[in-house]
Curated annotation (Swiss-Prot):
NCBIfam families: PRK08881.1 (NF006477). InterPro entries: Ribosomal_uS14, Ribosomal_uS14_bac/plastid. Keywords: Ribonucleoprotein, Ribosomal protein, RNA-binding, rRNA-binding. Signal peptide: none annotated. This is Small ribosomal subunit protein uS14. The gene is rpsN. It comes from the Bacteria. One of its GO terms (biological process) is translation. GO terms for molecular function: rRNA binding; structural constituent of ribosome. Binds 16S rRNA, required for the assembly of 30S particles and may also be responsible for determining the conformation of the 16S rRNA at the A site.
Length: 101
């Protein structure tokens, strides 16, 4: 089980990313625009850098829904490898079974 402080930190990052998503997208559009002047691009890049660091979506971590484990998470199921294996062995995941050849 992951520390609750780490899980809560990720939840906080998700909220910040949603809050600043539109503002961040608008500034990125200006920075990558061909029509914007050099000064406008520098100004937009400075404003983008002043946004909270945790508002960037790339700082979010995929975590297991059950255990909160940060690594070995299958995004298709939202579960870590250990919990996915346990669920598969119980037959809770339809269409998924242990390989045998």
């Amino acid at each position: 089980m992951a520390k609750t402080s780490m899980v809560n930190r990720d939840i906080k990052r998700e909220k910040l990313a949603k809050k600043y998503a539109e503002k961040r997208a608008a500034l990125k559009k200006i920075v990558s625009s061909v029509d914007a002047t050099y000064e406008e691009k520098i100004d937009a890049a400075t404003k983008l850098a002043k946004l909270p660091r945790d508002s960037s979506p790339s700082r979010q971590r995929n975590r297991c829904e059950l255990s909160g484990r940060p690594r070995g998470v299958y995004s298709k199921f939202g579960l870590g490898r250990n919990k996915l294996r346990e669920a598969t062995m119980r037959g809770d995941v339809p269409g998924l079974r242990k390989a045998s050849w």
